[in-house]
């Protein structure tokens, strides 16, 4: 049996979240694989707006650096418009961890570059503890910013 955890959904422009939702309305505001689909300037705007919405923290997950990604299945919103680095997040006050294994193992759409995929998938998993503490080597970044009250 699934728990009902959401009562209402809002659909709209992610850069208009401050107009759709109230200030400090959520304990945490999370953007998973979103920010890279915005231009860099828009990404920083999103971070500011997420900070406005959050009481305690904001969490962002994104590829480490720029990865070319074209429209998928005709969806123009799948295009990557920016790349984000550990230093980008450090400068914005985030703590950063690495996830999804070594950066050079994956390519477009986060797919493993080489076959057999099972072998390279195991290699990716085995490198997770390393990239967690050395996020510059990771394929994906997990960035957390504590909001000061």
Question: Could you tell me what each predicted segment is?
Answer:
Residues 1-17:
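Class I SAM-dependent methyltransferase SAM/SAH-binding core
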Residues 7, 27, 56:
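Conserved acidic residues
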Residues 15, 19, 39-149:
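S-adenosyl-L-methionine-dependent methyltransferase catalytic module, highlighting the catalytic core
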Residues 30:
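A conserved beta-strand element that flanks and buttresses the S-adenosyl-L-methionine
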Residues 33-37:
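Histidine-centered divalent metal-coordination motifs
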């Amino acid at each position: 049996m699934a728990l009902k955890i959401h009562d209402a959904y809002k659909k709209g422009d992610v850069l208009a979240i401050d107009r759709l939702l109230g200030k400090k309305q959520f304990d945490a505001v999370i953007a998973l694989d979103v920010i890279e689909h915005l231009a860099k300037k828009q990404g920083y705007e999103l971070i500011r707006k997420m900070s406005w919405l959050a009481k305690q923290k904001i969490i962002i997950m994104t590829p480490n650096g720029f990865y070319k990604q074209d429209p998928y299945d005709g969806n123009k919103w799948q295009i990557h418009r920016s790349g984000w680095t550990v230093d980008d997040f450090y400068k914005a006050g985030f703590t950063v961890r690495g996830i999804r294994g070594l950066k050079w193992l994956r390519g477009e759409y986060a797919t493993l570059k080489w076959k057999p995929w099972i072998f390279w998938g195991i290699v990716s998993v085995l490198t997770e503890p390393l990239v967690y503490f050395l996020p510059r080597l990771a394929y994906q970044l997990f960035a957390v910013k504590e909001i000061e009250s």
